[in-house]
Amino acid sequence: MLASRLPDVITLGCRLNLAESETIRSLAGSRDMVVINGCGVTNEAVRQTRVAVRRARRDRPNAEIVVTGCASEMDRNAFAAMPEVDRIIPNAAKLLPATWGGFPNHQPPRRHARAFVGVQNGCDHACTFCAIPQGRGASRSEPIGAVVTRIAALVEDGTNEVVLTGVDLTSYAGGLGALVEAILIGVPGLPRLRLSSLDTIEIDGRLFDLVTGEPRVLPHLHLSLQAGDDLILKRMKRRHLRQDAVTMIERLKAKRDIAIGADLIAGFPTESEAAFANTLALLDDCDIVHAHVFPFSPRAGTPAARMPQLRPEIVKERAARLRAAAAARKTAWLKTLLGSTQQIVVEKPGDRGHAPNFAEVHLPSIHPELVEPPSFSSPSERKGIASTGSARMGDTSSAPTVGSVITTTITAATDDHLMGTIA
């Protein structure tokens, strides 16, 4: 059940949405409101946004239900027709104070394991399967100075990990490498900087050197690969070929042990079994250990929706095979981390976190009810709280707080996560 009489922001979709939801939360004031920040990347994401709207109305019958994000941007009429929806806010207006009436936010600051910072929005490319440019518009970037100032304030308030987000992050104006370098120089107290989804074809020399040589840039990259077959990549209107991705990842991993994640689409129109096999083989050829697999979803208005479609059962079956192969690779990779020492940022409820390589680590001897983060009423109360922890099991007075960085020793591996003890 959602809390009553306070704004609640429900987020679906990408990390940029997560970053934007925090801004919305700070602008929404203290009204009886539920904001659904929806996703339109697939038909299923749009369906889930509608489900969230209906659930919000059921749980908060007297609240104002506000919908924003790509789902309502791309299908405004359908959301406007929903009786549960009171207001729709365009993406272009959702971060403007005037949109929310200029109400001050009286909610206590929320503690997060990491801060998502949106630095780029929109996309100038035309991938045939993607409807996101319809919802986000042309590419635009936040000024470097504004980004550095924002991150410096987060670190001052105790943030230990910042994740840079964007629709097409590597198209950041002036170069993503220049931005990363400015952050590292301008915010020397930032311990961990993580990059969200990157396009391999846009990783230039400056960014390559920072990713492979700067310890504060975490050794985990999520890449927008989509497919492993050249003909399918061309029909997707991607800007790279299979070998481009393989070569870039080989170069990266030759310099540093970087965990590779990737977005992959199964069942794209005209995909043959041989073409799918090339995508399946990409898991091994690119050493992918964090895979996001999507069954192809035809989005209205995109060129791919007009191409010859595969039967739904074939799309579903190929996505299942790709997910199973990806899961097996991840399990094998996790086993290689047994006995290692990993620094994790503690996440809610307080008994888990993610290592620099984005492996999830659970601490089975920590009791979550003992490690809930405190509420803060001022920045001075927040300062220093998220510093590296040194808690011992059973010592509740020094249990790690959400957002703190602790050192763990990995003692076991399951199919999808690690288990450890505090070192």
Model-based region annotation:
Residues 112-145:
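Canonical Radical SAM [4Fe-4S] cluster-binding loop centered on the CxxxCxxC motif
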Residues 65-69, 74-75, 156-274:
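Conserved SAM/AdoMet-binding glycine-rich loop
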Residues 1-96:
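Cofactor-cradling patches in redox/metallo enzymes
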Residues 298, 305-370, 385-389, 397-423:
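Terminal RNA-binding accessory module
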Residues 219, 234-347, 351:
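A structural motif corresponding to the C-terminal lobe/cap of the Radical SAM core domain
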Residues 101-112:
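Flexible, low-complexity linker/hinge segments
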Residues 147, 164, 195, 223, ...:
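Conserved, mostly hydrophobic/aromatic
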Residues 136-163:
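Conserved alpha-helical substructure of the radical SAM core
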